[in-house]
Amino acid sequence: MENRWQVLIVWQVDRMKIRTWNSLVKHHMHISRRANGWVYRHHYDSRHPKVSSEVHIPLGEARLIIKTYWGLQTGERDWHLGHGVSIEWRLRSYNTQVDPGLADHLIHMHYFDCFAESAIRKAILGYRVSPRCDYQAGHNKVGSLQYLALTALIKPKKAKPPLPSVSKLVEDKWNKPQKTRGRRGNHTMNGH
């Protein structure tokens, strides 16, 4: 019998990000109880030797599975030391890979209260509005002008520690272009 290959999208990440992600997931599962129903699986619960952990997030009938890997081939960067993350959406026998932004959006829609467009209508009608979203990573667009005005008027409290974000987990902060300030703002550019 011939070998059959299966292609899987794996986002290369720093191992410290994986450790942070796992500790945030465990904190919100066991201490804050905000990740209710989430299941964390250790590496010894998996049959695959390269899987270091799995997080199963129920989304109604479907579920999101975030797997972290170790011992992969190293990447082109120094910090690509063979660690990665795959994100899978599964419904019964159907499964597909999703990107981190969509994964965060799905988690946001299913689990967390949000200060959204409905809050603007409530504020106009005179109801008390709590201007905070528990899961900011689930927003992938800029809000309307009224939304921005309401958020500027009443500052939201930040939850500590933050909720685990898939986008933050796979974020490539090393390859982002550096932001340099002008001549006045950056002291190294003007010699002081």
Swiss-Prot record:
Which key words are in the record? AIDS, Host cell membrane, Host cytoplasm, Host membrane, Host-virus interaction, Membrane, Metal-binding, Phosphoprotein, RNA-binding, Ubl conjugation, Ubl conjugation pathway, Virion, Zinc
Tell me the segments the record calls region Interaction with host APOBEC3G.
40-44
Region span, RNA-binding: 75-114
Q: Where is this motif: BC-box-like motif?
A: 144-153
Q: Where is this region: Interaction with host APOBEC3F and APOBEC3G?
A: 54-72
- Residues that the record marks as modified (Phosphothreonine) are 96, 188
Task: Specify where the region named Membrane association lies, as residue ranges.
Answer: 171-172
Q: Where is the composition biased (Basic residues)?
A: 176-186
List the GO molecular function terms.
metal ion binding; RNA binding
Sites of the modification Phosphoserine?
144, 165
Looking at the Swiss-Prot or TrEMBL record, what is one Pfam family this protein matches?
Vif
Where is motif HCCH motif found?
108-139
Task: Give the span(s) annotated as Multimerization.
Answer: 151-164
Per UniProt, Zn(2+) binds at 108, 114, 133, 139
List the subcellular locations.
Answer: Host cytoplasm; Host cell membrane; Virion
Membrane protein topology class = Peripheral membrane protein
Q: Which domain of life is it from?
A: Viruses
What is annotated about its quaternary structure and interactions? Homomultimer; in vitro and presumably in vivo. Interacts with viral RNA and Pr55Gag precursor; these interactions mediate Vif incorporation into the virion. Interacts with the viral reverse transcriptase. Forms cullin-5-RING E3 ubiquitin-protein ligase complex (ECS complex) by interacting with host CUL5, RBX2, elongin BC complex (ELOB and ELOC) and CBFB/CBF-beta. Within the ECS complex, Vif interacts directly with host CUL5, ELOC and APOBEC (APOBEC3F and APOBEC3G) substrates.
Q: Which family does it belong to?
A: Belongs to the primate lentivirus group Vif protein family.
Q: Give any extra note attached to this record.
A: Vif-defective viruses show catastrophic failure in reverse transcription due to APOBEC-induced mutations that initiate a DNA base repair pathway and compromise the structural integrity of the ssDNA. In the absence of Vif, the virion is morphologically abnormal.
What the entry says about domains is: The BC-like-box motif mediates the interaction with elongin BC complex. The HCCH motif (H-x(5)-C-x(18)-C-x(5)-H) mediates the interaction with CUL5.
User: What is the name attached to this protein's record?
Assistant: Virion infectivity factor
Q: Which organism is it from?
A: Human immunodeficiency virus type 1 group M subtype C (isolate ETH2220) (HIV-1)
Q: What is the lineage of its organism?
A: Viruses, Riboviria, Pararnavirae, Artverviricota, Revtraviricetes
